Amino acid sequence: MLEDTTIHNAITDKALSSYFRSSGNLLEEESAVLGQAVTNLMLSGDNVNNKNIILSLIHSLETTNDILKADVIRKTLEIVLRYTADDM
């Protein structure tokens, strides 16, 4: 996976990026999930915007069989959606 700085710089929503960056260890698992989603988007050549992050997280949520991982993905999705409400 890419470095945290690269991941945060790739996110077009700077408020969302700042929120995760300033959360420290509080959102460590959620940051890892977000980082994986951003990395996947970057590697596939897609734009790293809230819409694509949301779609990536939904896909991850739909395809995981791990209940604990699904909970972390859901929490990450809720955070991203909170920062996207104005865009809808």
Curated annotation (Swiss-Prot):
Q: Which UniProt keywords apply?
A: DNA-binding
GO BP field: cellular response to acidic pH
Gene3D superfamilies in UniProt = 1.20.5.5260
Asked if DNA-binding is a keyword of the record, the answer is yes
Q: Name one Pfam family in it.
A: YmgB
Question: Where in the chain are disulfide-linked cysteines found?
Answer: none
Task: Kindly list the GO molecular function terms attached to this UniProt entry.
Answer: DNA binding
Free-text function comment from the UniProt entry: Regulates expression of genes involved in acid-resistance and biofilm formation. May be a non-specific DNA-binding protein that binds genes and/or intergenic regions via a geometric recognition.
Q: What family does the Swiss-Prot or TrEMBL record give for this protein?
A: Belongs to the AriR family.
Record note on quaternary structure = Homodimer.
**By what name is this protein known?**
Regulatory protein AriR
Q: What organism does the UniProt record list as the source? A: Escherichia coli (strain SMS-3-5 / SECEC)
Instruction: Name the lineage.
Output: Bacteria, Pseudomonadati, Pseudomonadota, Gammaproteobacteria, Enterobacterales
Q: Which gene encodes it?
A: ariR
